[in-house]
């Protein structure tokens, strides 16, 4: 009798995706982050669902409802902090996942890569709208500043901003629609994840060497299921240490003050995972220029398959490219630090230099170094 998992229409899909999937035998821990992102998404949807049962998307009661969740709901404080810090873990995994793709040349699977970039944009939009919901000071002013950036779009800018706000300022209508979008987007993300996996399974996974691994494949289960479970346990351990020992470590104290349109916080800044983009935005004195730089900082990832000039796919055997890659990582960490600093000397100039370096490394230095390495191969 044939095994049910190989014949049943639904089980067959699961089998081909997670059980009998032929996988390269040498993929390292850097390939764990895909499954960890799946875990993060599941945790966020579940905790978010339970939070939505008690939250009220109204300017008068939103802040109080979050307080009520933390004080009166059974384990409400735990659900709230798992959700808030789960977002941070989500972005850590996302950045490492994208970094892995950049280092090992996974972007040459360009359908998978492009869907991944769309996913990155949608996750960032979801996180931004989620940050507005507690209706604290940073929620309100963050929403005001970021939505206001759209007014830089020529001709339709101001109309567009008022259309998104649902009035002449960030108010009840804005909060209600942000809650609606924040609720629906994770399910759209789930659908996009399926598309992402569909494209990935068309080609099979890349591996650290960047070489074709068809001659050396092993089944996903049990080898990588066990490996993914280890990664999941470590992720949960780190998340729970964060949640139970210092839940507010990555948050902003200003968000414990209810939103007040009449008093601006001294330093408006987003959550830590947006600081690099915020620093790039602030480094350009012109409003429209800043917005374009902000969008370009993520869209630039789309150019990677076009700028890949090396004869080798992975950076595993390319020491000069490795050096440039780690310079890019250091630059992004610098931008993250600058994004959280006030707009004054010397932070302004450091931010501008780091922003220029970010675009230069990706658009000029990495392709140039690839060509040099190609020449060195002929020695």
Swiss-Prot record:
According to Swiss-Prot or TrEMBL, what is its membrane topology?
Answer: Multi-pass membrane protein
Q: Which PROSITE patterns match?
A: CYTB_CTER, CYTB_NTER
Keyword Mitochondrion in annotation: yes
**Binding locations of heme b b562:** 83, 182
Q: Which GO terms fall under biological process for this protein?
A: mitochondrial electron transport, ubiquinol to cytochrome c
Keywords noted in UniProt: Electron transport, Heme, Iron, Membrane, Metal-binding, Mitochondrion, Mitochondrion inner membrane, Respiratory chain, Transmembrane, Transmembrane helix, Transport, Ubiquinone
Q: Name the residues that bind heme b b566.
A: 97, 196
Keyword Lipid metabolism: yes or no?
no
- Transmembrane segment boundaries: 33-53, 77-98, 113-133, 178-198, 226-246, 288-308, 320-340, 347-367
Q: Which residues bind a ubiquinone?
A: 201
Required co-factor? Answer: heme b
Q: Which GO terms describe its cellular component?
A: mitochondrial inner membrane; respiratory chain complex III
Q: Name one GO molecular function term.
A: metal ion binding
Cofactor binding annotation: Binds 2 heme b groups non-covalently.
The subcellular location is:
Mitochondrion inner membrane
InterPro entries, alphabetized: Cyt_b/b6_C, Cyt_b/b6_C_sf, Cyt_b/b6_N, Cytb/b6-like_sf, Cytochrome_b, Cytochrome_b_C_euk/bac, Cytochrome_b_N_euk/bac, Di-haem_cyt_TM
CDD domains in alphabetical order: cytochrome_b_C, Cytochrome_b_N
Q: What does this protein do?
A: Component of the ubiquinol-cytochrome c reductase complex (complex III or cytochrome b-c1 complex) that is part of the mitochondrial respiratory chain. The b-c1 complex mediates electron transfer from ubiquinol to cytochrome c. Contributes to the generation of a proton gradient across the mitochondrial membrane that is then used for ATP synthesis.
Per UniProt, subunit arrangement is: The cytochrome bc1 complex contains 11 subunits: 3 respiratory subunits (MT-CYB, CYC1 and UQCRFS1), 2 core proteins (UQCRC1 and UQCRC2) and 6 low-molecular weight proteins (UQCRH/QCR6, UQCRB/QCR7, UQCRQ/QCR8, UQCR10/QCR9, UQCR11/QCR10 and a cleavage product of UQCRFS1). This cytochrome bc1 complex then forms a dimer.
The record's family statement is: Belongs to the cytochrome b family.
Remarks, miscellaneous: Heme 1 (or BL or b562) is low-potential and absorbs at about 562 nm, and heme 2 (or BH or b566) is high-potential and absorbs at about 566 nm.
Name-wise, this protein is Cytochrome b
**Which gene holds the coding sequence for this protein?**
MT-CYB
């Amino acid at each position: 009798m044939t095994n049910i998992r190989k014949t049943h229409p639904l089980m067959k899909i699961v089998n081909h995706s997670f059980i009998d999937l032929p996988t390269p035998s040498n993929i390292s821990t850097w390939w764990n982050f895909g499954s960890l992102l799946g875990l993060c998404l599941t945790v966020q949807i579940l905790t978010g669902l339970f939070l939505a049962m008690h939250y009220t998307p109204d300017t008068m009661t939103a802040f109080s409802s979050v307080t009520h969740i933390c004080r009166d709901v059974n384990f409400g404080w735990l659900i709230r902090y798992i959700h808030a810090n789960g977002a941070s873990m989500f972005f850590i995994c996302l950045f490492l996942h994208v970094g892995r793709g950049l280092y090992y040349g996974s972007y040459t699977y360009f359908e998978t890569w492009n869907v991944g970039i769309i996913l990155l944009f949608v996750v960032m939009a979801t996180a931004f709208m989620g940050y507005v919901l507690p209706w604290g000071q940073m929620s309100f002013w963050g929403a005001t500043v970021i939505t206001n950036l759209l007014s830089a779009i020529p001709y339709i800018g101001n109309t567009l901003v008022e259309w998104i706000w649902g009035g002449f300022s960030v108010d009840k209508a804005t909060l209600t629609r942000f809650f609606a979008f924040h609720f629906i987007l994770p399910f759209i993300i789930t659908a996009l994840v399926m598309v992402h996996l569909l494209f990935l399974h068309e080609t099979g996974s890349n591996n650290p060497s960047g070489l074709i691994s068809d001659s050396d494949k092993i089944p996903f289960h049990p080898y990588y299921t066990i490996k993914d479970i280890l990664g999941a346990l470590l992720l949960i351990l780190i998340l729970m240490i964060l949640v139970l020992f210092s839940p507010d470590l990555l948050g902003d104290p200003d968000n414990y003050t209810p939103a007040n349109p009449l008093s601006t916080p001294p330093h408006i800044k987003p959550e830590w995972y947006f600081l690099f983009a915020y620093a790039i935005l602030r480094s350009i004195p012109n409003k429209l220029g800043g917005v374009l730089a902000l969008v370009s900082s993520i869209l630039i990832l789309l150019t990677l398959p076009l700028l890949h000039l090396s004869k080798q796919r992975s950076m595993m055997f390319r020491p000069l490219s490795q050096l440039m890659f780690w310079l890019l990582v250091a630059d992004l960490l610098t931008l993250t630090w600058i994004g959280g600093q006030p707009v004054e000397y010397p932070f302004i100039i450091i931010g501008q230099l780091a922003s220029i370096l970010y675009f230069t490394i990706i658009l000029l230095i990495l392709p140039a170094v690839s060509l040099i390495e190609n020449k060195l191969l002929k020695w």
